[in-house]
Design a protein with these regions (language model features):
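Long, compositionally biased regulatory regions of eukaryotic proteins
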Residues: 2-3, 296
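Non-catalytic pre-domain segments flanking phosphatase-related domains
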Residues: 2, 10-116, 324
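Electropositive phosphate-/nucleotide-binding environments in soluble metabolic enzymes
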Residues: 36, 82, 122-125, 138, ...
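Cysteine/selenocysteine-centered motifs that mediate thiol-based redox chemistry or coordinate metal-sulfur cofactors
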Residues: 153-173, 177
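C-terminal cap/substrate-recognition subdomain and adjoining C-terminal extension
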Residues: 17, 21, 86, 168-169, ...
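Active-site neighborhood of HAD-like aspartate-dependent phosphohydrolases
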Residues: 39-42, 106-118, 122-153
């Protein structure tokens, strides 16, 4: 959505027209149910940071989510974006809301591809932890997973360690999990809307192919990159078919997808929560930390921490034009 009507003009009492103020940024405020922060307070904080607030407006949300959040946008002009961003992030953390500061260039960018991590991004669990629980080694694997996602362990080494603990698990546990996946709020609204806008949607996951393929079938993803568990005689061997889909692999896959579609990576967005998502998020034209680990939030200027996946649509310029689901 281009930032049209960037303040316009106003008339003084003697009919002189005030100077036009050009909007440099958009502030997106997403307030989940249970939180309380008025848009006027955000405007006050922006003004205290030296920004001029040109316009504020409410944005419709999908009908299915209308009782779960409110969304506002503020057009602003700011010369000190670093100071403004810091104040807005502090406000976000204090009130448990999502506030994104985006440049005019980012708002005007036409995005063609959206790539998503899967575990704890599209679904509300870590698949390897769920399978470990079924194998009776849940606590042990969950701790290793948490450390790996925080970037405290080498991903490949920790992944092999966790996989080895799954050895002997009945392969039916994977399909059983696929049948009861807990998906993130707003997933269907987001995928339907982005698909209706002609975007290519992809899952790049360090998780497992059967789970990713189930999401692909249910929600219309076009591409899937994930790990293939090695199965022998109906049992998990504790290994995957190489290569492991890790941090570097995801970034390479993003570049390859963009090249195949004949677009630059600046026309891609990447959404993730863990340390193994950071490279693809940094490479993309828009990287979004979604319900992310602290290190990922710290490295990402744009985040959605308290609301659902429909928040991605507001960052892409949606004014409530959500596709029917």
């Amino acid at each position: 959505m281009p930032l049209s009507g960037e303040g316009g003009t106003s008339s003084s009492p003697n009919n002189q027209r005030a100077p036009v103020v050009n909007a440099t940024h958009m502030i997106v405020l997403m307030v989940p149910r249970g939180a309380a922060l008025e848009v006027d307070r955000v405007a006050e904080v922006a003004q205290a940071a030296g920004a001029e607030v040109i316009e504020t407006r409410a944005v419709p949300v999908p009908v299915a989510l209308s009782d779960r959040r409110t969304v506002h946008k503020l057009l602003v002009s700011s010369a000190d974006t670093e100071g403004l961003s810091s104040k807005l992030r502090n406000l976000s953390d204090q009130h448990g809301v999502d506030i994104a500061l985006q440049s005019r260039a980012a708002r005007c960018q036409s995005y063609r591809v959206a790539v998503f991590d899967m575990d704890s991004t599209l679904i509300d669990c870590e698949v390897i932890d769920e399978l470990a629980a079924a194998a009776g080694v849940g606590e042990q694997v969950a701790e290793i997973t948490a450390q790996a996602m925080r970037g405290e362990l080498d991903f490949d080494e920790s992944y092999r360690t966790r996989l080895a603990l799954l050895k002997g698990l009945d392969a039916s546990a994977i399909e059983n999990l696929a049948d009861r996946l807990p998906v993130k709020e707003g997933l269907r609204e987001m995928t339907a809307t982005l698909k209706a806008q002609g975007m290519t949607l992809a899952i790049f996951s360090g998780g497992f192919m059967p789970i990713a393929e189930r999401l692909q079938a249910d929600y219309g993803f076009d591409e899937v990159v994930a790990n293939t568990l090695e199965i022998e005689s109906g049992k998990v061997t504790g290994r995957v078919v190489p290569p492991i889909v890790n941090r570097e692999h995801k970034a390479v896959a993003l570049h390859a997808l963009a090249t195949r579609l004949g677009i630059g990576v600046d026309a891609c967005i990447a959404v993730g929560d863990g340390a193994n998502d950071l490279d693809m998020m940094a490479m993309a034209g828009l990287g979004v930390a979604f319900h992310a680990k602290p290190a990922v939030r710290a490295a990402s200027p744009i985040e959605v921490t308290h609301c659902g996946l429909d928040g991605v649509c507001y960052l892409l310029g949606s004014e409530g034009e959500f596709a029917d689901t």
